[in-house]
């Protein structure tokens, strides 16, 4: 079975899709655990990694390439973790960190802005205007981050194998569609893929420590 990445905008219910999908397939479901693993592997304070991957790049980041260093730690930890296969990863930028991994199934989950606003209102008990501002800020930071490090927009559908919109489609519908795709030969973790994964992980580890 494959390695699956779930990318989503904030408050788009991608976490729920990932967790249900992992249960359906019998996969590991991982997210922020990778930050902790990177922190332990490279002896970097966890809070520094969190800021590096969640905050939009500052002027200093653009000059010193500070974010690149922290992202290298996370990428190395993630590549090491997914070598076992049978993983659903819904954390930070999986579709980008694993873009060189053959056969990884990259999924994008979308939701209508009205549904996202109501999700924030319900979860955080704020007004609709405040919810809209929070979503806009989060989306803007993700766009800036992706462009700074990879020169891509997370909304570019060419980055993904599957793009699904929650709303017209239920969570169970989305899980079913992804599970069906996950069984296709193109997305299986073959011995050749495992060899490539090991090589990528070794290279990423060396780059992170350099």
Regions from the PLM with identified roles:
Residues 35-86, 93, 126:
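ATP-dependent small-molecule kinase phosphotransfer cores
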Residues 100-123, 128-137:
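Conserved phosphate-donor/acceptor-positioning beta-strand/loop module used by diverse small-molecule
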Residues 180-210:
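N-terminal targeting leaders
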Residues 5-21:
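Glycine-rich phosphate-binding P-loop
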Residues 75, 171-175, 179:
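Short, amphipathic alpha-helical "lid/cap" segments that border enzyme active or binding sites
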């Amino acid at each position: 079975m494959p390695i699956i990445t779930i990318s989503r905008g904030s408050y788009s219910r991608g976490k729920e899709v990932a967790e249900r999908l992992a249960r359906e397939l019998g996969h590991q479901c991982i997210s922020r655990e990778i930050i902790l693993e990177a922190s332990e592997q490279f002896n970097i304070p966890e809070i520094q990694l969190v800021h590096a991957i969640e905050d939009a790049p500052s002027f200093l980041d653009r000059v010193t390439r500070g974010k690149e260093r922290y992202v290298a730690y996370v990428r190395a930890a993630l590549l090491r973790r997914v070598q076992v296969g049978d993983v659903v990863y819904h954390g930070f930028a999986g579709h980008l960190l694993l873009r060189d991994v053959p056969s990884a199934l990259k999924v994008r989950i979308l939701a209508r802005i009205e549904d996202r606003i109501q999700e924030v209102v319900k979860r955080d008990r704020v007004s609709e205007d405040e919810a809209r501002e929070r979503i806009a800020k989060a989306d803007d930071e993700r766009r800036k981050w992706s462009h700074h490090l990879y020169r891509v927009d997370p909304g570019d559908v060419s980055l993904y194998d599957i793009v699904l919109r929650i709303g017209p489609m239920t969570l169970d519908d989305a899980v079913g569609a992804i599970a069906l795709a996950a069984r296709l030969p193109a997305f299986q973790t073959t011995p050749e893929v495992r060899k490539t994964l090991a090589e990528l992980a070794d290279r990423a580890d060396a780059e992170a420590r350099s």
